[in-house]
Amino acid sequence: MGKISGSKKTILIVLAVFAALVLFPPLALVLAFLLLVRTLEDGRPQPVTEPVAWGACKVEPVELTAGGEPLPVTVTYTVGKGGLKEGGVIRLCPGKVLRLGPDAWQIRMQWGNGWGRLQRKDPSRNNYVEVRAPSADVVISVSMMEKAMDRTQLMWLKRKLMQKLGRDLERMDPRDAFMANLKITARLVQGSLAEGDPVEFVLGAGSGLRPPAGIITTDLACEVDRRGTGDFELDASLGQIDAVGGAPAVLEVIAPTLVAPSERFRVLVRCVDSRGLLSPALAGRLDISYEGAVGGPGSVIMTESGRGTAWFAAGAAGHGLGRIRVSATGHGVEGVSNPVVCRNAGYRLLWGDLHTHSIVSDGTQEPGYLYHRARDLLGWDYTAVSDHDTWSFGEERARTEQEFELMMRAADDHYHPGQFVTMRTYEWTNHRQGHRNVLFGPGQSPVFLPHTDERYSTPGALLAALAGRDAMVIPHHPAWKLHAGEMRFDFGPRDSSEGEGASMQRLVEVYSRHGNSEFYGCPRPISHAGMMEGAKGALVRAVLGKEYAGPNSGSYVRDALASGCRLGLIAGSDEHISAGDPRRAPTQLYSGGITGLFAGSHTREAAWRAMWERRVCGTTGPRMLIEFWVNGAHQGSEISSRSASVTGHVIGTTGLELVELVKFDSSGYRAVWQEGGTGPEVVIDWTDPRLRESCFYYLRVIQDDGHMGWAGPTWVEVEK
């Protein structure tokens, strides 16, 4: 549908009002939508291009406080050699530049970066855009789409409706259309600009640019059409604006959970604000004290370059439990570490997240940043960036070969054996049969098997195609009910009799930022709209109602386990938006989860073995120790016996409200042992003396602060 003229638009508005008053209000809304909203048709791909070193981009200030006061942000683009003639164009592109290679850059839009709507209508409101020429002799015209995100979303919905009605529209990636509509175009209509002349884009002129609620890093790239021919070049000089944490409120002290007696280890101190966001505002001496079986230096310096982080070396001083306290003298902030257990376990508990997303798919940051964040800013032992196999939004297109190669290369580049582990992975994102991450073992060459290819379009077909490879498939948020209606999650074949590759499904993500999929009625139920900010999220939740599957859907983790799937319980973040701690985001309903791997070392081989053997635990964020044995076999094992002796322990980061051992057999699920309310540590010692049938056990934990954890199951086959 083409552009509607002003007079016709007036007539259509009158008709819509008439229909609203006389006929049927919903019909009037549909009529107005069909006639007044333009169909999105032009979504030419953002070019992958070699950047040019021509001008220079500078941003002032370079950071605002997340959730703080709006301030004007000036992006100054200095014209390069040869100048800019009349008709030339400079486009400011707020988003993220993806470096597919040194000479292959592409501007990508950031979904939900939180900076708010840029506008040109009202200088008295936040986010007003003004473009300033260097002199009165130079006239610059400015064009941009008002409410670009909202209007493009409506245009996209109109596109979907027209396709449903039979209109043939060429497939497109919606990000391209969104990115094109978000750009600010400054055209030189009178005069010329010499080399060195500045053009200023003022974001929030007057009332300031409203910062997002959470931490984010956004590129302010410039595209230049020097001749006015419509041929744009991406300048290699990038501006950048950061939203950072506010005033220091708490020190987070992150130490290993399991260490050997007399072992030396590294400790991370993070300064966070009252909402848990990393704060760069603290610098100076930090005083350190020790409790129990740990010791080390009495102080450490947090430098300005540390941007709210400081590392120091400590050590175990024998067997037992220890904690580390850190305080900032004169600043009134302090913190205590997670519990440190000093014992000869023969393995470590590696903490990290197997489920994050980058700008390659629908995240907000480049893959390399996410690896840096995990290792240097969060103190994790491992991570995986599991970008989607497609960009869907109604028009699915598989990742390109160049994108997939970047994903795998980034994982390899950031793997440091003995220090930090990365996994090569991607997400198989089938909205009808369920999402799952595909991980490749240490010696396995990755293969890309998108669900858009008919050969890999079902969970069974995916597993069959992976058969014979060292790979693992991890289902996640199975209880997520799609907005279009109920979805029965397809867990795929349970064993080899049902299909090839069934044994590759070793783990299931019981919890993420989307919520909890343990069982119907569980705490923290699935709420995808919980990831949306403020009023928008509240509205979506009100319209959609419950977003989790029904009690008879078969989509919960307990359903899968009861049906014969042998899956260890883990947790992740499924982080898409925040550049900060995925366990915390002020705009989102739930914290992101993390997974502990009981592994022998910081290597891919050891981490892979721990996952394959299901020696794992998952939490909603804290570093709890959750560990148990059945007849001496570690959680995740499969054993044969006529009785079960269950031993173990849980050490929380706060008091433990409930620790329960859950058993399943033909009678269903039930808690056979419970304890809680006695402090941060619980010891498990329980016996099932006479087993009449095969069963399995797992642990579930609830802390006093509401955080949760899981470990297991362990399966017991009754000896005949």
Regions found by a protein language model. Give the residues of each.
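Extended, charged catalytic domains and RNA/DNA-binding interfaces, predominantly
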Residues: V250, A260-T303, R307-K720
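Short amphipathic alpha-helical segments that mediate assembly, nucleic-acid/protein binding
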Residues: K8-T10, L154, E263
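Short, solvent-exposed loop/linker segments at the N-terminal edge
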Residues: E63-P70, G83-L84, T257-E263, S637-R642
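N-terminal Sec-pathway targeting helices
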Residues: K3-P26
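Ser/Thr/Pro/Gly-rich, low-complexity intrinsically disordered stalk/linker tracts of secreted
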Residues: L31-V250
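Exposed regions on extracellular, virion, or secretory-pathway luminal proteins
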Residues: K9-L12, V17, M149-D150, E195, ...
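Hydrophobic residues in beta-strands and at strand termini
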Residues: V79, P94, L188, L203, ...
